[in-house]
């Protein structure tokens, strides 16, 4: 992957963290790299099972039982925003999925506190229990397939799958997908 990224024109900076490290040391490293680079660092790719920051007090999918902190890798991408863990108290009827309380390690913000400076992505095959392969083997398989795609060793079918069930509660949500998918794969290659 490193050579593929360099071949694509990226400058790669790498740091290895123990998977039990919480989100703050990883973010501090990202901030340090960003500042040392003179803002040349533009993207962050997290590979492996590292801390997933949780933040906020909302339910983006409209399910009230999920109100609380949601996964927020954007925490890593916001270099200078003020993220706090002191005010949100979630009353979500005992749901174990998304609790958020003051000083619990989950951030308060439901809205990103400042414009993000970085793109962020994650390749994490942890808890993929539906597969017989280990986390390491699944990651290796993904990276090998990624390499094959970049070098045109495979040519996957161009198609998209569109689920419109949220249109009932949030009108026109699928319109964005239609507008995005059609130019990428063509109208006839979209499956509902």
Positions of PLM-derived features:
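Cysteine-dependent hydrolase recognition
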Residues: 1-192
């Amino acid at each position: 992957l490193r050579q593929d990224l360099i071949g694509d024109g990226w400058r790669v900076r790498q740091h290895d963290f123990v998977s039990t490290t919480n989100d703050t040391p990883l973010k501090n490293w990202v901030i340090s790299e960003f500042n040392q680079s003179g803002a040349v660092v533009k993207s962050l790719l997290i590979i492996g099972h590292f801390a997933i920051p949780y933040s906020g007090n909302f339910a983006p999918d409209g399910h009230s039982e999920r109100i609380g902190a949601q996964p927020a890798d954007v925490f890593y991408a916001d270099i200078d925003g003020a993220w706090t863990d002191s005010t949100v108290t979630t009353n979500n009827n005992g749901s174990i999925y998304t609790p958020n309380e003051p000083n619990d390690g989950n951030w308060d913000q439901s809205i990103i506190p400042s414009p993000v400076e970085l793109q962020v992505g994650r390749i994490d095959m942890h808890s993929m229990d539906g597969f017989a392969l280990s986390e390491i083997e699944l990651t290796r398989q993904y990276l090998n397939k990624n390499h094959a795609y970049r070098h045109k060793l495979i040519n996957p079918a161009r198609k998209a799958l569109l689920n419109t069930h949220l249109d009932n509660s949030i009108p026109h949500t699928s319109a964005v997908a239609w507008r995005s998918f059609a130019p990428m794969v063509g109208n006839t290659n979209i499956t509902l």
